[in-house]
């Protein structure tokens, strides 16, 4: 397989077979330079995103929002700043799925200056938050 290197991007078609691994071109793997990738499926858009990562210690933070206010993002930003959570691999931002409103992000917890439990507790205190899920991605 020849990879087009002329422009800003390269593309290949990958074949999906249920229950079978997806194989990436050797040139892609070499250029990425990492041994693992965080793969995210965005349900609404049916889009998969792949992020090369150096660590497999990655957490999902999902906040279910029952009442989205103008202050939600400000309070979320304060909680992230207090925890020193700034290096986020991917975020949905605030989005709807059906009747529910969510904020989701994926991050490496090594950057935090608080425990995961402390981060979770601070997020639960934000007005309008009905549920917080914080778990390691497998």
Predicted features by range, described:
Residues 9-42:
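Short beta-strand-centered segments at strand-helix junctions
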Residues 2-10, 36, 41-138:
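A conserved regulatory-domain signal marking ACT and ACT-like small-molecule sensing domains
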